[in-house]
Amino acid sequence: MPSASASRKSQEKPREIMDAAEDYAKERYGISSMIQSQEKPDRVLVRVRDLTIQKADEVVWVRARVHTSRAKGKQCFLVLRQQQFNVQALVAVGDHASKQMVKFAANINKESIVDVEGVVRKVNQKIGSCTQQDVELHVQKIYVISLAEPRLPLQLDDAVRPEAEGEEEGRATVNQDTRLDNRVIDLRTSTSQAVFRLQSGICHLFRETLINKGFVEIQTPKIISAASEGGANVFTVSYFKNNAYLAQSPQLYKQMCICADFEKVFSIGPVFRAEDSNTHRHLTEFVGLDIEMAFNYHYHEVMEEIADTMVQIFKGLQERFQTEIQTVNKQFPCEPFKFLEPTLRLEYCEALAMLREAGVEMGDEDDLSTPNEKLLGHLVKEKYDTDFYILDKYPLAVRPFYTMPDPRNPKQSNSYDMFMRGEEILSGAQRIHDPQLLTERALHHGIDLEKIKAYIDSFRFGAPPHAGGGIGLERVTMLFLGLHNVRQTSMFPRDPKRLTP
């Protein structure tokens, strides 16, 4: 006589067979084998952003991440996310889906990547929680392409929740260190996607505008033999049997290109600052947008060209990236960025007068501190209703050695900074193009002439008057969007305390 245990097993096996037999949809779902480029199936994947009413009743394939899943009786609702776009998908028991398929879909780990075949259906009521609000996908097949681990280091819904909402409702938000420690997950949020797509737009508009103005894009060395601006804030690297340094800017090389008759040049590339500054706006590595240009008679020719380039960038962002701006504003509310045409220009002495009138004590040759920059930004906004402006004629004492002195006032210089929302985003000037004066200024700053010999020599064979400036990409992105920390606009930020990921 068979044992009770054996009897139970003999009963369970037919039930399993029966269940399997009843699962008429078993070929329509599951975990796919790893894609190793074995084949190229005749299948067209549709972008989630293209799932609109125009595709109603079409059968489509979509590859996306499982953002959320919610089982309800004999059906399961999924939100499928692809970059910053998402769509609701419905898996319901019927001709194409068995109860086992519904259960499988409901238990797919969040952030897993799936291939879904479904029919695009128009919905009677807009789906407010999705970007594709007028349609949903009725799933006929679903296969897991890449399975995410069940425990995520952070929840994406928490990562996009406005801080004010989290505080008021006692709901979770994600702090900065957690975001940066798990940057790959954080970059998947709609806010991060919008920030870095807009940042890409800044680079594109910068390049597009300058090429249209007749500029040539150049690439300059990042490993150099001496501190590029004569300062101590450089990273030292081993260079065979000698020391070399990471460039603080492409400054000296873009000037040498002007001496080589390129006339108008720009570059986009990394710059390095060994400054132990743990502030909201400093990084040890960031992307520099640099410009240098020969002029005819006055450095304002260059200053105005740079200002116009910035205005073209602002216009382009507002015209082409409204969706991204609105996405960021949803989590980080901010007033729209304002600018004037032509750009407001104030002399440094005028800025000092405004600050002194507001109660700030400053000497004529003092540099602006960060709090005073912010205060000046508020004063300028109140008086002129602009977030973007230029300060001209800085004190010579606070500028680099290659800055041209003002011929009318030896304590001033032919230099300027540009500001967004009360924070400096560009520092620029007319450069000294006379080798004798350049040598004198370098010695005044205590710079070893031997280490910048090639730079000074480039001016000995005839050099046109020229000027330029350097812009911090991450700062421009941060300030245009009204964000509060430059680490939000650096994809993988580097600061004195962070070297990974």
From Swiss-Prot:
Modified residues (N6-acetyllysine): 74, 374
Gene Ontology CC annotations of this record: aminoacyl-tRNA synthetase multienzyme complex; cytoplasm; cytosol; extracellular exosome; membrane; synapse
Gene3D superfamilies assigned: Bira Bifunctional Protein, Domain 2, Nucleic acid-binding proteins
Tissue: Expression in the developing and adult brain shows similar patterns. Highly expressed in the ventricular and subventricular zones, including hippocampal subfields, the midlateral temporal cortex and the frontal polar cortex. The cerebellum, cerebral cortex, hippocampus, and lateral ventricle show preferential neuronal expression. Expression in the peripheral neurons is evident in the colon.
Region called Binding site for the 3'-end of tRNA, residue ranges: 411-415
MF GO annotations: aminoacylase activity; aspartate-tRNA ligase activity; ATP binding; RNA binding
Region Aspartate: start-end pairs: 251-254
Location(s), subcellular: Cytoplasm, Cytosol
Binding site for L-aspartate: 229, 273, 427, 431
EC class: ligase
Disease as annotated in the protein's UniProt record: Hypomyelination with brainstem and spinal cord involvement and leg spasticity: An autosomal recessive leukoencephalopathy characterized by onset in the first year of life of severe spasticity, mainly affecting the lower limbs and resulting in an inability to achieve independent ambulation. Affected individuals show delayed motor development and nystagmus; some may have mild intellectual disability. Brain MRI shows hypomyelination and white matter lesions in the cerebrum, brainstem, cerebellum, and spinal cord.
Subunit text: Homodimer. Part of a multisubunit complex that groups tRNA ligases for Arg (RARS1), Asp (DARS1), Gln (QARS1), Ile (IARS1), Leu (LARS1), Lys (KARS1), Met (MARS1) the bifunctional ligase for Glu and Pro (EPRS1) and the auxiliary subunits AIMP1/p43, AIMP2/p38 and EEF1E1/p18.
Name of the molecule in the record: Aspartate--tRNA ligase, cytoplasmic
Organism encoding this protein: Homo sapiens
